[in-house]
């Protein structure tokens, strides 16, 4: 059966209706009656009594005193009484109330006429859109046939009859006081008007089947079928077969009730035929209909679902009470499918009504709907259509078919993106034709939608001077207005028709919506920047990019103009004229910048208002065009931005005032809300121009390419066939062959993606004006490979510096030759400080040998530097648990510094000859380091001063300092100037930042992301990112230098033999007692100048061993005439140590006092005699040997007076204490030992120890309990290995030393002392 193509035309304009709100003034209020007070009620009566009294008095006196004044006075009082009685009454008079009531009733009559006018307009519009069923037969073949599109309000709204419908205009009464105070007659009149006029009586009403998944119809079969026929007749008359399909399953399909459906093109099955033509969705069973509908229902989402592109809606009629409506799709409902099921089963009384699946009852010409309370009237007068009338309409429609080239869209009706641009198939673009050169007048001029008259709306981005609307524009639209849809339409039209050498785009969305990300792969798109609200660095980067592009274009115009014409070009137009004249210049494409949600950007970054103003002013000449888009317009924030815009686009806005600000009138506010009105707006092409109403094309939907036409060939002679509603089988000798049809197996793709992929594969990409931010980690290997740094130059890369203004990234390079060779890295917790040090060390090691660079590390930052301990370039890694290694590290570096200062360690070849090369002291976490090794008197680590010295003095001698700290304030002031290279990572508090930008409202530190370790700022406020090191590279680097490593840090031995320090007696009375930790030099005690020595330590700390070493060394290097010993050894530890003959050794306490008295008497004799002259005194010297008083464990000897014997009342140390101050001159040497525990108290109470401490005797503090609160000369004891201690001289500068162990050889030989005690293993005692 052949059909004619129905040519669609633009829909006739229906009668207009006025919407909005009709505000009604409230009725007048009755006056409130306030009861008078008692005084006001009584006062008139008192005045009357007074008047009567006066008159009586006048007559009682014979009226002799009557005068005109006296006669007038009673009348005045009478008038006053009357005024009080009447004037005090605040009641409104009846006449006034009547007058106000009459005025209000006249006002209501005017309102009633206005409301009736609204109702009449609404009725006319409804009658136009939903005429009587009898009128439908006149529609086929006219312009109104199939007039409804998805964008129309009445799309898929099917008339069901007549009913009272609400008035479109809302009636609102202004706020009033309590209704009790209203004038009753006026109030009743108002209530009557509202009750009557709020509805339009007996108006056409319909069912919006787009919002219904199922309609259950109950009633007599004939009556229900008549109603359903009326609904279907409405549907097929107004809706194109491409937008609406009809399907039926009825046992009596061939009866007159439904056989007429066979004539409708809406029931055709696509690409399928039977013996008489197209197959039909008409079956006798639900199962058969389900099978036939399966392809059409396969990919539909569940009901309800939002869809950008309208699906073909299906009306599925089941005229079978026994059928299951859910059996059609075996699901509760599908989008775009409405099942109309006629049944006889009444709903259960407890059944809850479903608004998406209504149950209707057709009876007595009415339609009722099942609600919670039972059946409620739905349609007062139901439409009904006989089978004959329906067949008549179907036959009239049967001759027509829809135009396959007429594509309908929810946005623009028949005008789509592809039709407006003349693209037959967006999946097979002719890019060469689309990007072909065009005249300047046609450039940047593209259709983006249609106007209210159906004409294409052209968006011309060119400058006004070139005939366009630009260069800059403003678009405002609230949420749901279609702002993103309009922006996408503009972008896609421009990008589809312009190559990258004519147009490039930057899309910036501050709010973070990802809708524009689909444009990211277009070749003309420089960048799609989203989520700037959460990543402030993106906003700063965007600003730098705009400033940089303005500067770049200005520089290009200057250089090209001077080369071509001797002076700079004033604009890109002159630049392009030079290209047209034959000069070889690169193209300069127009830059189109879309700033979406720019008001939110200005709220967070107010300084960007000046940026946009600057770019808008300068960009006009440089072809940088800006389109500002937002949901609202904050005049206070945007400053002069709106003054720099020429064209305006106003979509649906939130208030009339915003509409007036954008387009000059309130029309943008009155745009209707709803999905069907998205993308509607007004374009003002120039200031003061008349707004043009338009609707933008919808480009964000799935694109379905046009399919090849399917031909049906019948190879048989024509034979008459009976045309039935059901399937007609072909004749036996008839063969139906179908042509090959292309099957699209690819997944659905959006139109934008379909076009973007083709453009990306064809054309060159835009210049790289935007580099992605430093969000992704950078491997150190990649940085080393990409950096232009030669090995061995004492320069190595650390990461990358981001320079969006120059539109490039530079390598962050450390240069040891510059003044910035000392490095400070400061950042908050987990900011990547330790990883940065790893990158620093590994990068240097990758380019230098261990002889050229060495590292010595102090790991206070959590252990990451310890991972570098195996690197050949690392001499040592010390942790806070290794204080000795830390001290030795500084000792080695100080010794190296002194050596290089003495000999200027750089030879003629420019390298160091001491084997260390360039030395780096690396301290991770200076804050923790500075608070280590502290006490009450030393709140900072004493070693911090050595770091400061190295930072300030070591640079000239190849010694560098690299430190990290959580806070710049933790760096000592004296050290700061020596730290030339300062890198700042993310800080806990941006107020601690030392990076400043002049004139900036915000600190640059605020823009550093918190979740990206290694990201930071240079002192020039440039963002950088440290490279990510790989510890697996350590083995690779070590393999390059087999057998070569950095000099290790030498530690003090735990068992020091005398041979290691020979000679032990380098000068008279100078005894080498051990080795100093700082420089590993021998430590000697010069008893001639420092005759007093105190040794404190706990058991087995080395006290007695030191005494043994001193005795042995002095005895072996002296004669009995030179030296004598007095040894007091309470515990017999020194009994086996031989002395000179006649020397005193005692372990008996009773012998201590006589020995001390004899020694003191001997020493006293060495004083010069009285009567010597000054010259004799200057030449006076004592004669005799030097006497060494050695007391082991002096704290064990009681200092109490003797209670018996010849020395009653005398103390052992009294006479010796008086000689200590002159011990050096009198040849007395005093060496005492004592326990560390309690020693602080002992030096304050014991006479001998107190005097020695007062004289600043040389003090050796061996191992002791650190929890002991006592201190010796400001120093607390610590746990040391045996023989290790702290030596305090008269300068109070402590030296950590290791004592000589003279017992080592004896222990190895197994000697046994004279007292029978075995020296176990050569232990210190």
UniProtKB/Swiss-Prot annotation:
Residues annotated as binding ATP: 477-484, 827-834, 1097-1104
Pfam families noted in UniProt: FtsK_SpoIIIE
Effects seen without this gene: Deletion of the gene impairs iron-bound mycobactin utilization and EsxG and EsxH export.
Main location: membrane
Family matches, as PROSITE patterns: FTSK
Segments forming domain FtsK: 454-660, 808-994, 1080-1268
Classification via InterPro entries: AAA+_ATPase, EccCa-like_Actinobacteria, EccCb-like_Actinobacteria, FtsK/SpoIIIE/SftA, FtsK_dom, P-loop_NTPase
GO MF, one annotated term: DNA binding
UniProt entry keywords in alphabetical sequence: ATP-binding, Cell inner membrane, Cell membrane, Membrane, Nucleotide-binding, Repeat, Transmembrane, Transmembrane helix, Transport
Entry keyword Nucleotide-binding: yes
Superkingdom assignment: Bacteria
TM stretches of this protein: 42-62, 65-85
Location(s) in or outside the cell: Cell inner membrane
GO cellular component: plasma membrane
Self-association state and partner proteins as the record states: Part of the ESX-3 / type VII secretion system (T7SS), which is composed of cytosolic and membrane components. The ESX-3 membrane complex is composed of EccB3, EccC3, EccD3 and EccE3.
Protein name: ESX-3 secretion system protein EccC3
Gene that this polypeptide is encoded by: eccC3
């Amino acid at each position: 059966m052949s059909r004619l193509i129905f040519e669609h035309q633009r829909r006739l304009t229906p009668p207009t209706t006025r919407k909005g709100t009709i505000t009604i003034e409230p009725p007048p209020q009755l006056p409130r009656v306030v009861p008078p007070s008692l005084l006001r009620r009584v006062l008139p009566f008192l005045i009357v009594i007074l008047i009567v009294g006066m008159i009586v008095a006048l007559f009682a006196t014979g009226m002799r005193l009557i005068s005109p004044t006296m006669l007038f006075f009673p009348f005045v009082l009478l008038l006053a009484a009357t005024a009080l009685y009447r004037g005090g009454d605040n009641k409104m008079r009846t006449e006034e109330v009547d007058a106000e009531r009459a005025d209000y009733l006249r006002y209501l009559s005017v309102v009633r006429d206005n409301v009736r006018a609204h109702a009449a307009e609404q009725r006319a519009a409804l009658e136009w859109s939903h005429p009587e069923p009898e009128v439908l037969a006149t529609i086929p073949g006219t312009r109104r046939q199939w007039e409804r599109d998805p964008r129309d309000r009445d799309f898929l709204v099917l008339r069901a009859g007549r009913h009272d419908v609400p008035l479109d205009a809302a009636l609102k009464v202004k706020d009033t006081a309590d209704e009790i105070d209203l004038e009753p007659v006026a109030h009743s009149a108002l209530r009557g008007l509202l009750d009557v006029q709020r509805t339009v009586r007996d108006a056409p009403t319909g069912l919006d089947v787009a919002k219904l998944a199922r309609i259950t119809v109950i009633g007599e079969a004939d009556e229900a079928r008549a109603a359903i026929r009326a609904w279907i007749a409405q549907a097929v008359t107004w809706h194109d077969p491409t937008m609406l399909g009809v399907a039926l399953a009825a046992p009596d399909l061939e009866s007159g009730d439904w056989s007429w459906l066979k004539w409708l093109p809406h029931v055709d099955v696509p690409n399928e035929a039977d013996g008489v033509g197209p197959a039909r969705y008409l079956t006798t069973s639900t199962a058969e209909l389900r099978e036939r509908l399966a392809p059409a229902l396969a990919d539909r989402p569940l009901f309800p679902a939002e869809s950008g592109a309208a699906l073909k809606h299906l009306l599925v009629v089941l005229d079978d009470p026994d059928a299951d409506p859910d059996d059609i799709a075996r699901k509760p409902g599908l989008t775009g499918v409405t099942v109309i099921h006629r049944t006889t089963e009444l709903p259960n009384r407890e059944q809850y009504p479903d608004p998406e699946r209504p149950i209707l009852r057709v009876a007595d010409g009415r339609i009722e709907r099942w609600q919670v309370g039972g059946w409620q009237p739905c349609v007062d007068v139901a439409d009904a259509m006989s089978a004959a009338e329906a067949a008549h309409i179907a036959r009239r429609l049967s001759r027509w078919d829809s135009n396959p080239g007429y594509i309908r869209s929810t946005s623009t009706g028949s005008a789509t993106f592809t039709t407006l641009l003349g693209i037959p198939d967006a999946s097979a673009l002719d890019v060469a034709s689309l990007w072909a050169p065009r005249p300047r007048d046609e450039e940047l001029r593209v259709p983006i939608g249609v106007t209210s008259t159906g004409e294409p709306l052209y968006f011309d981005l060119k400058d006004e001077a070139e005939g366009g609307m630009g260069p800059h524009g403003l678009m405002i639209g609230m949420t749901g207005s279609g702002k993103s849809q309009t922006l996408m339409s503009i972008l896609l039209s421009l990008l589809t028709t312009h190559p990258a050498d004519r147009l490039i785009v930057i899309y910036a969305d501050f709010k973070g919506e990802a809708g524009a990300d689909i444009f990211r792969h277009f070749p003309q798109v420089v960048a799609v920047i989203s989520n700037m609200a959460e990543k402030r660095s993106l906003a700063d980067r965007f600003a730098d990019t705009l400033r940089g592009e303005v500067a770049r274009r200005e520089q290009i115009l200057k250089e090209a103009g001077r080369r071509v014409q001797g002076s700079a070009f004033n604009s890109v137009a002159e630049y392009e004229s030079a290209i047209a004249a034959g000069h070889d210049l690169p193209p300069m494409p127009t830059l189109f910048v879309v700033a979406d949600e720019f008001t939110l950007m200005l709220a967070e970054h107010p300084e960007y208002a000046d940026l946009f103003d600057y770019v808008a002013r300068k960009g006009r000449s440089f072809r940088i065009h800006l389109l500002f888009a937002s949901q609202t317009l904050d005049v206070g924030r945007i400053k002069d931005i709106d003054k720099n815009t020429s064209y305006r686009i106003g979509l649906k806005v939130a208030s009339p005032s915003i509409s007036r600000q954008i387009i000059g009138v309130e029309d943008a506010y009155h745009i209707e809300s709803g999905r069907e009105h998205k993308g509607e707006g007004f374009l003002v092409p120039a200031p003061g121009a008349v707004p043009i109403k338009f609707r933008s094309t919808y480009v964000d939907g799935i694109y379905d390419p046009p399919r090849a036409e399917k031909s049906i060939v019948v190879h048989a002679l024509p034979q008459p066939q009976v045309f039935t509603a059901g399937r007609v089988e072909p004749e036996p000798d008839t063969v139906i062959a179908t042509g090959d049809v292309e099957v699209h197996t690819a997944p659905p793709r959006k139109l934008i993606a379909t076009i973007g992929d083709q453009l990306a594969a064809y054309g060159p990409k835009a210049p790289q004006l935007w580099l992605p931010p430093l969000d992704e980690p950078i491997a150190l290997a990649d940085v080393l490979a990409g950096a232009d740094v030669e090995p061995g130059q004492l320069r190595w890369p650390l990461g990358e510096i981001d320079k969006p203004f120059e539109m490039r990234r530079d390598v962050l390079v450390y240069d040891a030759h510059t003044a910035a060779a000392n490095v400070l890295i400061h950042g908050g917790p987990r900011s990547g400080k330790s990883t940065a040090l790893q990158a620093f060390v590994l990068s240097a090691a990758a380019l230098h040998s261990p002889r050229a660079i060495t590292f010595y590390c102090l790991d206070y930052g959590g252990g990451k530097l310890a991972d570098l301990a195996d690197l050949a370039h690392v001499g040592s890694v010390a942790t806070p648990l290794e204080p000795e290694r830390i001290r030795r590290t500084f000792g080695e570096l100080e010794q190296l510094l002194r050596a290089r200062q003495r000999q200027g360690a750089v030879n003629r070849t420019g390298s160091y000859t001491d084997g260390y090369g360039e030395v780096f002291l690396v301290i991770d976490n200076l804050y923790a380091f500075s608070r280590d090794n502290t006490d009450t008197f030393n709140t900072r680590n004493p070693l911090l001063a050595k770091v400061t010295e190295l930072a300030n003095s070591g640079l000239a001698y190849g010694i560098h300092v690299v430190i990290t700290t959580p806070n710049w304030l933790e760096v000592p002031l004296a050290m700061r100037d020596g730290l030339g290279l300062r890198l700042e990572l993310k800080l806990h508090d941006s107020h601690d930042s030392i990076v400043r930008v002049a004139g900036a409202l915000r600190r640059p530190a605020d823009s550093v992301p918190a979740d990206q370790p290694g990201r930071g700022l240079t002192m020039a406020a440039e963002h950088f990112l440290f490279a990510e090191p790989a510890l697996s590279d350590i083995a690779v680097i070590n393999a390059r230098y087999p057998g070569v490593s950095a000099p290790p840090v030498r530690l003090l031995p735990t068992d020091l033999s005398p041979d290691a320090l020979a000679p032990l007696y380098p000068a008279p009375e100078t005894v080498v007692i051990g080795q100093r930790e700082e420089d590993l030099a021998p430590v000697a005690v010069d008893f001639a100048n420092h005759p007093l020595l105190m040794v404190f330590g706990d058991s087995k700390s080395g006290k007695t061993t030191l005494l043994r070493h001193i005795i042995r060394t002095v005895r072996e290097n002296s004669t009995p005439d030179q030296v004598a010993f007095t040894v007091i050894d309470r515990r017999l530890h020194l009994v086996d140590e031989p002395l000179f003959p006649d020397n005193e050794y005692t372990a008996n306490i009773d012998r201590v006092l006589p020995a001390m008295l004899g020694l003191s008497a001997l020493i006293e004799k060495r004083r010069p005699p009285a009567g010597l002259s000054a010259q004799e005194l200057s030449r006076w010297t004592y004669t005799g040997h030097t006497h060494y008083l050695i007391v082991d464990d002096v704290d064990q000897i009681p200092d109490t007076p003797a209670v018996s014997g010849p020395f009653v009342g005398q103390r052992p140390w009294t006479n010796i204490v008086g000689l200590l101050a002159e011990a050096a001159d009198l040849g007395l040497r005093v060496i005492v030992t004592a326990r560390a525990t309690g020693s602080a108290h002992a030096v304050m109470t014991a006479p001998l120890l107190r005097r020695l401490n007062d004289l600043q005797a040389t003090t050796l503090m061996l191992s002791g309990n650190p929890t002991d609160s006592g201190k010796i000369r400001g120093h607390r004891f610590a746990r040391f290995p045996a023989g290790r201690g702290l030596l305090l001289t008269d300068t109070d500068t402590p030296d950590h030393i290791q004592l000589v162990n003279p017992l080592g050889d004896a222990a190895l030989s197994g000697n046994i002392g004279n007292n029978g005690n075995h020296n176990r293993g050569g232990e210190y005692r």
